[in-house]
Each structure stands twice: as C-alpha cells, then as structure tokens.
C-alpha cells in the first residue's frame, strides 16, 4: 500500500514538472487573444467572517504604582461580529491578460453581539464601569442623588442585527504584464486597481435609540443598514513564478478611502443628543460642529498589506484542463488611526477614534479545476489583531483645549472637539480591544467561457 501511494505521488509530481506552467489562482486573469477571443468568468462566492475579542476599559487603581496610583485595564465585555455574504463576480477579458471585473455583494447578515466578560467564572456585571456609570458626556452627574446611568444596555447576549441588503459594488481592472507561461525567463506579474462605490444603504448608529440607549435593531426582525458610504481605492500587485509543482507568490496592496456626501458624522445628531438626559454629547461640541468643519467629520483609515504564499500542485492534466492545487499563505495588514465605525459603535451609537493596529494571519485554500469551464475554490483563514484603543478623542485642536475656558462642554468653548465624550475619551475611561481572533471561510464556484 505504501508503495502504491509513493508511486502515485511520484507520477503526480512528474506530471506537474513536465506540464506547462499554469498561473496561481491569485494571479488568474481573464484574457482575450488568438484562439480565445472572448474570455468570460462568472463566479458565486460565499464569504463568512467571524471577529471575536475582549473589550477592556481603563480604571484608576490607587493600589497600583503607590503612592501615585495608575490606570489599569479591567475586563468589561466579550464581543462577536459575524458576517455572511454572497458575492457574484463577473470578469471579461479585453486583451491578452487584461480584464475588467465587477462584484455585486449581497450581505445576508452582519450581526454584532456582546455580553459581560467572565472573571473567575463569574460575569463582571456587578462591578462593571458600564453598568455603574454615574456621569454624562459632559462629565456631569447623571442624577444629583448619585443614581447610576449605564452607558448602554448589556444583556446575556445583546445583538444588533444588520443585513438583508445589497452591499457596496466593486469594479476594477487587472493586467498581467508578464507571463511565465509565455516567457519562462520572467515571472507572472499582475497589477490591478479596484474602486468600491458607496452604494450600500448608510448606517446611522444614533438614530432611533431608546431611553436606555438601546439600538432599534436589537430585534432580528428589524435588521439595520451597514453601509459606510465611503469610496475605496485599492491598488495591488502580485508576482508569481511556477517552479515545477510549486508556485510561490508575493502580493502587496494599499487601500485608501474618501468620504462621500453620505458619510456619517457624529455631528449629525450632536445638538439633539446634547439635550438628552443624560446628555450623549457636549453642548459646546454641538455648537462647534459648524466651525470645525471637516476636522469634526469622519477620519478614514488607510490600509497597507503584504502576502507571502505558495500553491502546491499535486495533480495537473493540461490536456484536459484539470488541476488540483493547495494554497498556503501568510499575510499582514496595517490599518491606520481613524475616527470611524468600530466594535464600540453599535453599543455607543458613535464613531470613535481608533488606534492603528496590525492584522496578521494565515490562509489554507483548496482549488479544484474539473475542466476548462468549471472550478471550485474553498479556503479558511485565521488571523489576530494587535491590541488597540477603541476610543480616545483629543480634547481640542492639536490635542489640547484652552485651559482658561470650560472644558466640560457645558458652556461655550470654540476649541472643544465636537466628538469628545468624557465617558469614552478621557484617560482612565478609554476602551481597548484585545485577544482578537478573525476566522474566515470562503467557498466559490467558477464558470469560465
């Protein structure tokens, strides 16, 4: 039996070594050339992503660093976000190794859940700074008698539901500048550019909140929108070189974002939120929205990343256009600082200042090409993010506000940041995201004509 397995492996390896080099899936591009004037690829992909992590919050501890005391991170919440989407993709070859493509995603669900963290097997509800909060956004007591006013509701598994809507349309172009199949002295070099249009319905995290600050979308029968209403520009390049049964590759990409006319801002509801009891925004900040202009609006991140990997080809039959390949890769993405949606948004109803962080992970993929016309793709990935703050706005322009004026936000102060909330942004009250895991699954069927 062992000899048979060894012979089979040897035959597959020899076939792969003898076969013409075929491009790795990461560099696959629709083409148009002599003998194949029209290349049309249609695929339907299911993507599932699960993000999990722990939210901690700074708290003053007089016993730490005596006699001065210090801020320590205390466990508050466990957070989960699960996204499921169907993504039809269409690609047309215009010229040799030159394609245009479009993706039309439909988000089945994008649900955010949280519950109290456990310490020594018990929920932290009784000692939670979320439950026992006593101040409003202007650092004023919620109640003269000292009654608490929780920041937001936390149940056994509070969930805010999103989805059941079309996502942002993505369109782009990809060009294989060099091809190792045509010239074995060169690698396959692919460059591409994608544009994501802000077509998904905008999500307003503060709209429709109850007296307890619960989201109107805590019912699965009333899922909310999820659109960010930003333009996204993605540039990427991939290099790959087939070496017998192994096809190593390298990818680099950068993504930039630009606000649209529909991009959400905390200033949209600042005036009405400042008049709530307890106040959810500062009175001075609401008055400053106009004078601060773009400085008060969403501040979008940019993302840059590298991927290193290889496809292993245990079987390939060029005459029948059949191929089995295994994809193994490692990747890392840097996400810059921002004031945008983050895991705290569905709870707080706000955009928050988020620290930069690094996402690192790996992917395992299996690709089965049954014929020239049909192939199946499946992959699983696991990643983690470096710990980062989810809140921490600067008090004023350049990080400071005029100390000679009221910095609470109760009375006028043109230097006060309209986004500043004493409950979330003051040192000693900031939230932090850690112990994260990002698990992804993707399955796709591809038809090629």
Show where each model-derived region lies.
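Outer-membrane beta-barrel biogenesis signature
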Residues: 20-73, 182-186, 320, 424, ...
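Short loop/turn motifs that connect adjacent beta-strands in outer-membrane beta-barrel proteins
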Residues: 24-38, 97, 113, 178-189, ...
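Transmembrane beta-barrel outer-membrane domains
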Residues: 35, 77-85, 162-168, 184-186, ...
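Transmembrane beta-strands of outer-membrane beta-barrel proteins
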Residues: 38-44, 100-102, 171, 187-193, ...
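Transmembrane beta-strands of outer-membrane beta-barrel pores
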Residues: 44-52, 104-110, 168, 177, ...
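Structural signature of outer-membrane beta-barrel channels/translocons
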Residues: 91-97, 105, 174-180, 238-244, ...
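Outer-membrane pore/translocation modules
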Residues: 111-299, 418-429
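Outer membrane beta-barrel transmembrane domains
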Residues: 127-131, 261-449
């Amino acid at each position: 039996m062992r000899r048979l397995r060894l012979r089979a492996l040897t035959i597959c390896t020899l076939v792969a070594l003898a076969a013409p080099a075929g491009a790795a899936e990461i560099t696959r591009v629709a083409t148009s050339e002599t003998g194949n004037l029209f290349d049309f690829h249609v695929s339907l992909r299911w993507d599932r992503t699960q993000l999990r992590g722990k939210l901690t919050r700074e708290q003053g501890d007089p016993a730490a660093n005596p006699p001065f005391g210090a801020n320590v991170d205390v466990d508050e919440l466990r957070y989960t976000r699960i996204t499921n989407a169907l993504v039809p993709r269409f690609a047309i070859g215009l010229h040799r190794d030159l394609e245009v493509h479009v993706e039309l995603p439909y988000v089945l669900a994008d649900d955010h859940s949280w519950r109290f963290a456990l310490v020594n097997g018990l929920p932290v509800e009784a000692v939670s700074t979320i439950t026992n909060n006593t101040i409003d956004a202007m650092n004023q007591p919620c109640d003269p008698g000292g009654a608490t006013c929780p920041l937001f509701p936390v149940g056994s598994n509070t969930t805010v539901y999103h989805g059941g809507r079309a996502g942002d349309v993505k369109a782009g172009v990809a060009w294989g500048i060099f091809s190792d199949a045509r010239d074995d002295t060169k690698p396959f070099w692919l460059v591409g550019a994608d544009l994501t249009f802000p077509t998904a319905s905008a999500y307003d995290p503060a709209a429709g909140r109850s007296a307890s600050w619960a989201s109107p979308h805590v019912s699965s029968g009333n899922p909310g929108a999820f659109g960010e209403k930003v333009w996204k520009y993605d540039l990427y390049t991939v290099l790959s070189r087939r070496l017998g049964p192994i096809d190593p590759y390298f990818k680099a990409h950068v993504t930039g974002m630009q606000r649209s006319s529909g991009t959400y801002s905390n200033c949209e509801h600042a005036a009405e939120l400042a008049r709530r009891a307890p106040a959810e925004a500062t009175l001075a900040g609401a008055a400053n929205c106009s004078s601060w202009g773009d400085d008060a609006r969403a501040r979008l991140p940019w993302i840059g990343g590298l991927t290193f990997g290889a496809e292993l080809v245990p079987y390939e039959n060029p005459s029948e256009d059949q191929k089995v390949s295994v994809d193994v890769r490692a990747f890392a993405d840097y996400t810059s600082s921002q004031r945008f949606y983050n895991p705290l948004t569905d709870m707080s109803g706000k955009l928050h200042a988020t620290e930069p962080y690094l996402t690192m992970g790996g992917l395992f993929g299996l690709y089965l090409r049954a014929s020239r016309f049909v192939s199946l793709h499946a992959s699983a990935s696991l990643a983690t993010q470096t710990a980062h703050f989810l809140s921490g706005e600067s008090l004023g322009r350049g990080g400071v506000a005029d100390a000679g004026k009221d910095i609470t936000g109760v009375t006028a102060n043109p230097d006060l940041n309209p986004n500043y909330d004493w409950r979330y942004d003051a040192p000693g009250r900031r939230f932090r995201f850690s112990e994260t895991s990002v698990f992804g699954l993707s399955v796709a069927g591809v038809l090629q004509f």
